[in-house]
């Protein structure tokens, strides 16, 4: 089975999980995640960081209000520069899907955590945009209702299979409160991806663009 097919299957298997067991993440899993994060940071210019065995970020009223429990590991999405939220979404989701392949569960988190400065290395000019809770879930999560292909995409004439498959994969991507405020438009041999305004919609756009690439079997040069 090729790597793209494995990732496509991973997309279908992954669901958001908010309650975790106290099982520590295995050392070899931590190493694999750190290796991927190092490569992503070198490619993207971001400063993503894996934090393990640190429960303070989710020990707050808002975290409990968001029904998070047992979270002591997370991916911190940190960086600077243009289109920061979108880039964090695009590259952060790559770590999320690797974590799923390695047996972990996850949940993208916007504002229900507190920044633990001592656990993070935030340099001058950098911003913490969000975190992703990681760990061994008490459950595997559940699927949620998604929009139809026609609600989030458009093209002139018959829709090519590759474009349809890209949109289908994007519809399985996590978005803030399942809002799916994105749209794909086929323009010849290019695709325009846009997001209407909503909380975290730019980060969502990065996530769904990566999903589209996986489903369609294309690279980032597809974008108009």
Predicted regions and their residues:
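Acidic, surface-exposed loops and disordered segments
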Residues: 1-224
């Amino acid at each position: 089975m090729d790597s793209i097919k494995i990732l496509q299957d991973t997309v279908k298997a992954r669901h958001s999980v908010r309650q975790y067991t106290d099982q520590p993440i295995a050392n070899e899993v931590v190493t694999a995640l750190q290796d991927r994060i190092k490569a992503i940071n070198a490619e993207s210019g971001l400063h993503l960081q894996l934090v393990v065995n640190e429960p303070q970020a989710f020990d707050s009223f808002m975290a409990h209000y968001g029904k998070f429990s047992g979270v002591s590991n997370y991916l911190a999405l940190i960086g600077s520069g243009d289109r920061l939220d979108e880039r964090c979404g695009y590259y952060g989701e790559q770590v999320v899907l690797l974590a799923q392949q390695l047996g972990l569960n996850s949940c993208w988190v916007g504002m229900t955590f507190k920044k633990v400065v001592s656990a993070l290395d935030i340099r001058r000019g950098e911003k913490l945009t969000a975190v992703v809770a990681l760990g061994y879930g008490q459950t595997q999560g559940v699927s949620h209702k998604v929009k139809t292909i026609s609600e989030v995409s458009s093209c002139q004439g018959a829709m090519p299979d590759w474009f349809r498959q890209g949109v289908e994969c994007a519809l399985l991507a996590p978005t803030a409160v399942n809002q799916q405020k994105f749209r794909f438009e086929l323009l010849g041999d290019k695709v325009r991806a846009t997001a209407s305004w909503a909380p975290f919609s730019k980060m969502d756009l990065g996530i769904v663009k990566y999903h589209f690439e996986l489903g369609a079997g294309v690279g980032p040069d597809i974008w108009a």
